[in-house]
């Protein structure tokens, strides 16, 4: 038999093995989904609260991916300015042999980071009084209130203040709907990341891989998968930072316990990527009772995502083998590769021109959070 015939047979065998593996993995996930409620009922209250928070974050990130909604983002930004910056970055790479592994998509991300921070979004320490237009010592907090019953803007909480100069109430609704944030163009880290991800997804297209990163100690950022660098890249739109996972522990001096990345197809514990100094690691058992239970339940949540992804494919394509192959290539293989490569941590070069300490938020606030760079 010719070598070409052998290659064909080996390729056919490999495809059969992949299909069989994908089918077993899918059936296992379906079975796990049926047991999830029973599994949850066995957790203690501490672990239940933690898991419910993860579910809430995961569900929030399933929204606002419809193409017609994403088009709204493109109408709200200065595309000409962004692409002018992208072209400049690409020219510098070619003329100065700068950043050889970065591709055009990476330059779009870099330029959006710069544009978003410096030209589009604004940080809010305290809301501005509608009458005197001031937002300093005249604005004093008076408590918080819950969201309205009809809540299209997805308000999580309303911070209430009073302007002592004008003697009027001032409110600061914490919006989560990125379409609303395209109007307000302001907020703190949650608003910044929600709006940035929405615009980034619109710019890069539906095939791009973008995920939301949640830290248990009250910070959020995001990542995208770079086809040029072939790995997940850290992005912090509040700070305008690209590929600096050491930022929080080694620059800010922030102590953290957990960091989770929420993607379309799976949730990943990325604590080891971002908690880069042992003295900045808060004991995870301060927030949960059992590390094993948390890991097992995250596996269950990932099974849910896998089943949902396959079900959505099956709605539009009836070829089972083709769907199973796609499931393997688009979900199982990527997830398994990241789990396997967690042991081989990539050393990311530190950018020395980043200022010390957190740059967003006033000095008193960043100091109270242990993010001012003074260890």
Question: What does each of the following model-derived ranges do?
Answer:
Residues 117, 121, 200-205, 226:
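Hydrophobic/aromatic-lined pockets within catalytic cores
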Residues 185-203:
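Short N-terminal edge-element motif at the start of the domain
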Residues 196-197, 208-211, 248:
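Generic recognition of flexible, low-complexity loop/linker segments
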Residues 197-201, 218-228:
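Catalytic nucleophile-His microenvironment captured as a short glycine-rich beta-strand/loop
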Residues 201-217:
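Short, well-structured beta-strand/strand-turn elements
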């Amino acid at each position: 038999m010719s070598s070409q015939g052998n290659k064909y047979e080996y390729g056919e065998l490999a495809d059969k093995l992949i299909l069989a593996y994908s089918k077993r993995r899918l059936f296992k996930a379906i079975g796990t989904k049926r047991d999830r409620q029973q599994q949850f009922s066995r957790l203690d209250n501490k672990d239940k609260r933690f898991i419910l928070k993860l579910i809430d974050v995961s569900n929030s990130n399933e929204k606002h991916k419809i193409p017609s909604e994403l088009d709204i983002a493109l109408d709200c930004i200065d595309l000409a300015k962004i692409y002018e910056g992208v072209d400049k970055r690409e020219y510098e790479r070619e003329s100065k042999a700068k950043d050889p592994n970065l591709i055009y998509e990476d330059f779009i991300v870099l330029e959006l980071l710069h544009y978003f921070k410096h030209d589009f979004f604004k940080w809010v320490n305290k809301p501005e009084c509608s009458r005197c237009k001031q937002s300093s010592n005249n604005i004093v907090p008076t408590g918080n209130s819950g969201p309205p019953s009809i809540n299209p803007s997805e308000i999580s909480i309303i911070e209430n203040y009073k302007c002592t100069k004008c003697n009027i109430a001032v409110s600061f609704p914490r919006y989560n709907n990125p379409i609303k944030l395209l109007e307000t163009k302001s907020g703190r880290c949650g608003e910044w990341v929600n709006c940035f991800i929405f615009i980034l997804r619109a710019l890069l297209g539906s095939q791009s891989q973008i995920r939301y990163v949640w830290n248990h100690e009250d910070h959020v950022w995001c990542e995208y998968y770079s086809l040029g660098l072939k790995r997940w890249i850290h992005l912090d739109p509040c700070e305008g930072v690209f590929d600096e996972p050491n930022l929080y522990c080694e620059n800010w001096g922030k102590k953290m316990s957990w960091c989770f990345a929420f993607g379309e197809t799976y949730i990943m514990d990325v604590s080891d990527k971002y908690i880069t100094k042992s003295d900045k690691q808060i004991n995870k058992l301060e927030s949960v009772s059992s590390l094993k239970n948390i890991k097992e339940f995250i596996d269950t949540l990932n099974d849910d995502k896998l089943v949902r992804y396959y079900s959505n494919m099956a709605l539009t394509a009836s070829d089972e083998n083709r769907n199973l192959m796609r499931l393997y290539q688009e979900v199982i293989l990527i997830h398994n590769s990241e789990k396997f490569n967690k042991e081989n941590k990539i050393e990311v070069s530190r950018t020395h021109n980043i200022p010390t300490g957190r740059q967003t938020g006033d000095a008193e606030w960043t100091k109270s959070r242990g993010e001012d760079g003074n260890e």
